[in-house]
């Protein structure tokens, strides 16, 4: 790959950073990447380069989208914080105050605080989940609402890597009526002109980078 495939700008003070970025792309270590850095309130680096697909046929663009995985948990928590700010949600109240079906099988006293702090002991599914149904929101939220926690909620930490989205997202939906993706878009992303999605529209797929494992 040529150095010409690295685009954007870099403050001359940070030329070494640009050189490292270019080297990682040119060497093939990164198929494609983007890097933005603010220093003392000023954007000093905004670089992108390489390709956004495994076949290396589509150049990485300034607006290429990437899957940020669990970074989304922080975005969802921001939506929760907005509901708290609006006094529509009290994190010290039981989840079942907002999602009645959740309050069963040992989860009756689980608070929103427990859920947000990954202390709800609901870090997995006790029953096998159907393949190819990950987008079936009602199915998975119902499974979580009905099952018993793995241990007593609120007593220990356990990262809810896969279940947090359904748990927190359903809490938002029960309070507001909108999906977490729509709530974030309407209340946070669009007003702040953020190009961040929770759920992609078909029109965005062409600018979404492949996931390479």
Language-model regions, residue ranges each:
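Short glycine/proline-rich turn/loop motifs
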Residues: 1-2, 56-62, 146-151
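Short, conserved catalytic-motif segment at the N-terminal edge
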Residues: 5-68, 90
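Short, surface-exposed loop or secondary-structure junction motifs
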Residues: 42, 53, 105-213
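Short, conserved phosphate/pyrophosphate- and ester-handling motifs at nucleotide-, phospho-/glycolipid
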Residues: 73
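Active/ligand-binding-proximal structured segments within catalytic/core domains
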Residues: 76
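Juxtamembrane transmembrane-helix termini
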Residues: 79-88
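Short, glycine/proline-biased beta-turn/loop segments that scaffold the active-site neighborhood
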Residues: 91-105, 190-192
């Amino acid at each position: 790959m040529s150095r010409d495939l690295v685009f954007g700008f870099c403050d001359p003070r940070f030329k070494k950073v640009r050189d490292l970025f270019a080297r990682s792309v040119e060497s093939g270590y990164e198929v494609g990447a983007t890097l933005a850095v603010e220093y003392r309130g000023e954007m000093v680096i905004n670089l992108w380069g390489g390709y956004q697909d495994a076949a290396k046929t589509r150049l990485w663009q300034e607006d290429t989208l990437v899957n940020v995985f669990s970074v989304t948990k922080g975005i969802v928590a921001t939506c929760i914080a907005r509901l708290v700010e609006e006094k529509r949600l009290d994190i010290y109240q039981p989840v079942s105050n907002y999602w009645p079906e959740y309050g069963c099988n040992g989860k009756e006293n689980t608070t929103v605080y427990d859920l947000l702090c990954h202390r709800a002991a609901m870090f997995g599914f006790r029953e096998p989940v159907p393949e190819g149904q990950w987008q079936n929101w009602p199915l998975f939220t119902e499974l979580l609402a009905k099952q018993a926690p793995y241990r007593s909620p609120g007593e220990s930490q356990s990262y809810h890597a896969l279940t947090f989205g359904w748990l927190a997202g359903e809490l938002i939906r029960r309070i507001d009526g909108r999906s977490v993706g729509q709530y974030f878009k309407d209340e946070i992303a669009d007003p702040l002109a953020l190009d961040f999605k929770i759920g992609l529209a078909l029109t965005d797929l062409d600018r979404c980078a492949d996931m390479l494992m």
